[in-house]
From Swiss-Prot:
Its EC number is 3.1.3.-. Keywords: Hydrolase, Magnesium, Metal-binding, Nucleotide metabolism, Nucleotide-binding. PANTHER family: 5'(3')-DEOXYRIBONUCLEOTIDASE. Phosphate binds at residues 18, 103, 138. This is Putative 5'(3')-deoxyribonucleotidase R824. Its cofactor is Mg(2+). InterPro entries: 5'(3')-deoxyribonucleotidase, HAD-like_sf, HAD_sf. Belongs to the 5'(3')-deoxyribonucleotidase family. GO terms for molecular function: 5'-nucleotidase activity; metal ion binding; nucleotide binding. The keyword Nucleotide-binding applies. Dephosphorylates the 5' and 2'(3')-phosphates of deoxyribonucleotides. The active site is at residue 18.
Amino acid sequence: MDNCELVGSRIRLGLDMDGVLFDFDSKIMDKFAEMGIQFTDVKEMSSAVEFDKSIKQRHREIYHVPGFFANLPPIKGAVNAYKYLKSLTDINNNKIFEIFIVSTPSFRNQTCCIDKINDLNKYFGPELLEKVFFCRDKTLVNLDILIDDKPEIRGFNGSSECLSDSNSVTNKMSFQHIRFHSDMYKYSDDVPIINNWIDGTYIDVVKNVCVDKNLLREVVV
């Protein structure tokens, strides 16, 4: 993004944790395997959760167990992607992003929040701990962009499914929702989506959204 210039102040970029920074689904599959329930991949588990009520109930019970969120492994490339985004500057050498963590806690899991804090500290460092939001309604958080694996972010201030259609409902959400691909969900074809943190394509996705939302402008040198 060295050919871009910030239009205003630093861009407030929110990152979800489960399924975006940390491999939530692989640990769920491991717990199912301990019960003798084997899935070949996340897609197979997703289908079972969707169509089998008993599997859906067990899926919920797994992450409600205290300690589940402790020592979740980071998704491949997530740590390096965070460091890269944090380091980016524009043509005037201004830092582009101020990065926040926005995560939904499991209130039935008494150790959820402290386990997530420890995971962040272990892999992403103590600096990020000052910028963590645990909240049930992410639409209330004042961001420019939120990267989240959910197909839709819905809450008091509206729905990210409606942001492209101004005639549908009144939206007060401050941020553009970028989806991070998960085989647990199905996504529309017309939404910005990041498929992984490894191959570098996420950079163009984020840049294009920033330009489209007039947060960055491209400069011809």
